[in-house]
Amino acid sequence: MAWIQLRLNSTNEKAEKISEYLEEIGAVSVTFMDSQDTPIFEPLPGETRLWGNTDVIALFDAKTNMQQIVRLLQQKNHLDENTAYKIEQIEDKDWEREWMDNFHPMKFGKRLWICPSWREIPDENAINVMLDPGLAFGTGTHPTTALCLEWLDSLDLTGKTVIDFGCGSGILAIAALKLGAKSAVGIDIDPQAILASYNNAEQNGVAERLQLFLSEEKPTDLQADVVIANILAGPLKELYPIISNLVKPQGDLGLSGILSTQADSVCEAYQGKFTLDPITEREEWCRITGKLNSFV
């Protein structure tokens, strides 16, 4: 499958806002490079580790009207006559090769390993999740994914039900099933995420215990013992009524995709219904966990 790449030059002061806007108007991924083409891997909105002169690189579906994208950028003053930009078609294989070369087995917590299928398993006796997430979905290399995996490893999931809200590659739901959960549900807005999650679940022998739904198609009465959502602070606050209602009485909630500077506002949204644990931080990111109050 081909993608369309838009590459435009920016300053580090503007690059973050441009990145966020590109995602709003349909970019499936955004990366940053300096003038020497040194990448920052797996950025999320809010990253600040940029260079003085930064190239913003966005991938769009091949059917995207790029002239419309350019017009939208111009209307927001993200693109003017002095801004250099380039549009070209990119094949998946160019990106997948770079990703595969840099993806190694990783350990999370005491029991859990995430292993690319093309590499040797470091510990045959551990709980191993074999992962082929494909382009633009999580692999565990970002601090937020790592925080979520470590939290799941710390729980006794034996016989429990789990919901992975914003499942992406399915990495969290699959890890929960391998860690002993009875069943899991993955929810996402992207059909490609649903497909990637199913393929990864099948590869790990847990597909029969994993249900997958697009957000608008999930059952209205859906609930689980453990709910985990690794998305972003804005959606976590906006979707509080939906996410909180997915948790069974006395159930556990895990939230990430949150910058440390955003933790207080997310806690404020959830603390009325949940008894929250101390916040766990890594680099610029954090994880918020808690248990649904019995009086709710």
Swiss-Prot record:
Gene Ontology MF annotations: protein-lysine N-methyltransferase activity
Family matches, as CDD domains: AdoMet_MTases
Signal sequence extent: none
Enzyme Commission no: 2.1.1.-
Protein location: Cytoplasm
Similarity-based family: Belongs to the methyltransferase superfamily. PrmA family.
Descriptive protein name: Ribosomal protein L11 methyltransferase
Source lineage: Bacteria, Pseudomonadati, Pseudomonadota, Gammaproteobacteria, Pasteurellales
